[in-house]
């Protein structure tokens, strides 16, 4: 990972790494060498809930310990987030409060299915309960004096729409402003689509050729009509 970051560091203004935070020492060493990288730690609830979902007995404590150490060393770009589902929705506001106390960013996502994770059975069953927990979070965010948190409130309002199968509030810019590259060089709009949508492969094409190709335009059309 260090070698990859070292190369990207030369070319990118911002690098953010998502992790479960389990290997604290490795993450700290990485941040010491690259002080401007962002770290986002995925925590799926309070201790019991997180450990059950993640299948790691000490997962919450390890992730939380990593967060605290990064704060103590005054790392400038730290945050955490959770993917909300029936099992952890009740912990949503508690985790937000925890992030607030530590002065961190708090990101949310909703449970979903994807070809990339070979999963098609992720379903939120108690939608009213989960929606209410999102509503509680929205009210908390709107109490803040931070405009960024007001925008996060709007985003979370959009997640309520999403879990009820309604039209998304914000347009998706995947394949237009952002993209996903898998380890084999395939460039895709994201890793959250139902089927694999490949714009091209960097081992076989130059970036300009790939990005401006007919195949890429076909994928963008798929994104325009994506209901996810």
Over which residues does each language-model region extend?
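Glycine/alanine-rich phosphate-binding loops at beta-alpha junctions
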Residues: 1
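Short beta->alpha connector loops
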Residues: 19-24, 84-88
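Residue-level signal for short amphipathic helical patches enriched in basic/charged
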Residues: 18, 87, 154, 202, ...
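His/Asp/Glu-rich metal-coordinating catalytic cores
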Residues: 27
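Flexible mid-to-C-terminal extensions adjoining Fe-S/redox cofactors in radical SAM and related proteins
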Residues: 169, 184-228
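Radical SAM enzyme [4Fe-4S]-AdoMet core and its adjacent flexible, acidic
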Residues: 5-7, 11-14, 33-178, 182-188, ...
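Conserved phosphate-coordination/catalytic loops
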Residues: 21, 57-61, 213
């Amino acid at each position: 990972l260090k070698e990859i970051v070292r190369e990207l560091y030369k070319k990118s203004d911002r690098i953010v790494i998502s992790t479960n935070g389990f290997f604290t020492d490795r993450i700290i060493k990485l941040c010491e060498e690259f002080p401007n990288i962002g770290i986002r730690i995925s925590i799926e609830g309070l201790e019991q809930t997180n450990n059950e979902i993640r299948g790691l007995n000490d997962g919450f404590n390890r992730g939380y310990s990593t967060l605290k150490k990064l704060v103590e060393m005054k790392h400038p770009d730290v945050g955490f987030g959770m993917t909300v589902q029936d099992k952890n929705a009740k912990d949503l506001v508690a985790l937000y409060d925890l992030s607030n106390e530590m002065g961190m960013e708090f990101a949310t996502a909703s449970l979903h299915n994807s070809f990339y994770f070979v999963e098609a059975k992720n379903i939120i069953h108690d939608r009213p309960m989960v929606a209410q927990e999102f509503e509680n979070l929205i009210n908390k965010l709107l109490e803040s004096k931070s405009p960024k948190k007001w925008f996060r409130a709007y985003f979370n309002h959009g997640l309520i729409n999403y879990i009820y199968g309604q039209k998304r509030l914000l347009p998706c810019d995947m394949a237009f402003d952002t993209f996903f590259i898998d380890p084999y060089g395939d460039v895709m709009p994201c890793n959250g689509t139902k089927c694999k949508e490949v714009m091209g492969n960097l081992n076989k094409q130059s970036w300009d050729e790939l990005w401006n190709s007919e195949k890429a335009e076909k994928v963008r059309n798929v994104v325009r009509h994506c209901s996810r």
